[in-house]
Each structure stands twice: as C-alpha cells, then as structure tokens.
C-alpha cells in the first residue's frame, strides 16, 4: 500500500526515531511503512492520522482504487 508517511514526517521536521517514540513502535516499523514493506494495523493508521491531523486516506493510498 502506497503512502505519504515519509513526506508528512519530513514536513513536520521529525526523524523516524522520534515518530516511532511518539507512536510507541520501533524505528524499524516506521522505516518499513515508509518503504511500503509493511501495512499498518488499523490502530496504528489511526494514530498516524491523528498525529499528522489528516485522514487515513490522506496518508495511505490503495493502488487498486487508482486503476
């Protein structure tokens, strides 16, 4: 699943480690999300959306819907 996580994180001026600490996950989880190697749980998706003050759909895009 494609996402804008890295873009949003950089816009907010925080590192992967800082975001991981805020969300109580590992830095590796954030890296895997940013590189499309991991799909988040619904709870983590909501935490990310709440932190960045956007909707889940503004972070995560379903490539199948774009076709």
Name the predicted role of every residue range:
Residues 11, 50, 60-67:
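Short, charged recognition helix plus adjacent turn
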Residues 3-22:
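Short basic helix-loop element that most often maps to the first helix and adjoining turn
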Residues 25-38:
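Recognition helix of helix-turn-helix/homeodomain-like DNA-binding domains
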Residues 18, 29, 58:
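Residues in the helix-turn-helix
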Residues 37-47, 65-66:
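Short, basic-rich loop-to-helix N-cap that marks the start of a DNA-contacting helix
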Residues 43-58:
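DNA major-groove recognition helix of helix-turn-helix/homeodomain DNA-binding modules
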């Amino acid at each position: 699943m494609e996402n804008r996580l890295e873009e949003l994180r950089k816009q907010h001026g925080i590192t992967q480690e800082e975001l991981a600490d805020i969300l109580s996950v590992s830095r590796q989880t954030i890296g895997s999300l940013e590189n499309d190697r991991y799909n988040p749980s619904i709870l983590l998706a909501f935490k990310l959306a709440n932190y960045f003050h956007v909707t889940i759909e503004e972070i995560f895009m379903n490539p199948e819907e774009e076709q």
